[in-house]
A protein has these predicted regions:
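Glycine-rich, low-complexity segments
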Residues: 2-37, 85-88, 124-135
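Short, well-ordered helical secondary-structure segments
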Residues: 21-22, 30, 41, 65, ...
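Detector for repetitive beta-architecture
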Residues: 3, 14, 31, 40, ...
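Acidic, glycine/polar-enriched metal-coordinating patches/loops
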Residues: 45-135
């Protein structure tokens, strides 16, 4: 019997088909600028080199980004607003990206960014896979 192997979050919800509102999963296959109204959504991407640009900090926002491409085929980039940074793995990267590189990417790799109580940076609150900080 064939085995299905998947690592990553359980994707709950429905994709928005036909412009209906109220859905929390969105597949993006081109660069996308996230807006505060997207808070709570899970964005998926299986296309190489997609960049998700986070909005300016607004406390209480949470966004999830999932690599749904085959292993080793996708770069998934999370980019903060030019005035903000991302706190990840114990250090702050001011106006620098967090990247799930093609060489290390696995299907199901994900990162969750939240604006907890800061007006200066996003915080990575959950991650699976190898995400590198832009130098």
């Amino acid at each position: 019997m064939a085995k299905t192997l998947f690592r990553g979050p359980v994707l709950q919800g429905k994709f928005n088909e036909g412009g209906v509102t109220g859905f929390n999963l969105e597949a993006k296959e081109a660069n996308y600028t996230v807006v505060n109204g997207d808070s709570g959504k899970t964005f998926t991407s299986k296309t190489k080199d997609v960049v998700f640009t986070l909005p300016a900090i607004s406390i209480g926002r949470v966004f999830t980004f999932v690599n749904t491409a085959s292993d080793g085929t996708n770069n998934l980039t999370i980019s903060p607003n030019a005035n903000d940074g991302i706190l990840y793995a114990g250090s702050l990267t001011d106006d620098k990206d967090i990247i799930n590189t093609q060489a290390t990417s696995k299907v199901g790799d994900y990162i969750v960014c939240a604006s907890l109580n800061s007006t200066a940076h996003w915080t990575v609150v959950a991650v699976q896979g190898v995400f590198a900080k832009e130098s």
